[in-house]
Amino acid sequence: MVGVRSFRPADRAAVRDISFRTGFMGESAESFWRHKESWADLWTSYYTDQEPEALHVATMDDAVVGYLAGCRNTAGMRPSTEELTKAVIRRHWLLFRPGTAGFLYRGLFDSMRDRERAGGDFIDPHWPAHLHIDLLPAARGTGLGAALMRRWLQQLEEADSPGCHLLTLVENTRARKFFEKSGFRIHGNPTLVGGMRGKRGERLHQQIMVWNLLRG
């Protein structure tokens, strides 16, 4: 049996685990970030702890195999992504950990040389909401991703939200096609992602995509 439902506190560990296991274009983030707890803090703690009503999970035989983490008002996030990132770096001593320091210092170097690069939160009143979505390999191609997306966009429609945005990697073609099929479109030009590299050492690019509520 497969299905989607609202997040429950008991799902927190599974959501954190999935975020790490799918953190690099659907594969494990371990290739560049070898500290699971700090990764999960960065990418899931706001949603599980501050806005759980906007978090939805996908299940197979009652096991959580994916999630969609939403935020209805990015401008109102407390802490903001930048504040959260700084706090997690301090709390876990990430600048001194062998499994994370290289990525962070490479990102700092990239930020000094890149004129156009991926920044912090995208704030625009036309698309105030945002989302992250991650599925384990076994859940892909089952319709669960589409079901999660429909559930989240319906929640935004019921709240009369004007729109939603997301950030994805240009190089993640499967994800981009899924988002386009879900009604998202490209907004603006891609920007370089600091610190991150592809499997062959190439630079990666971030793309903003947006969805608008269609009013009758």
What is each residue range found by the language model?
Residues 75, 167, 185-201, 207:
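Conserved catalytic-core motifs of GNAT/GCN5-like acyltransferases
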Residues 132-133, 141-155, 177-181:
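Conserved acetyl-CoA-binding loop-helix of GNAT-fold acetyltransferases
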Residues 32-55, 61, 116:
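Active-site rim helix/loop that mediates acceptor-substrate recognition in acyltransferases
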Residues 3-17:
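A short beta-loop-alpha structural element at the N-terminal edge
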Residues 57, 63-72, 117:
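Conserved beta-strand in the GNAT
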Residues 24-43, 82-90:
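Conserved GNAT-fold acetyl-CoA-binding loop/helix
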Residues 75-132, 196:
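Conserved acyl-donor/pantetheine-binding loop and adjacent beta-alpha core of acyl/acetyltransferases
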Residues 127-129, 156-169:
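Conserved GNAT acetyl-CoA-binding A-motif
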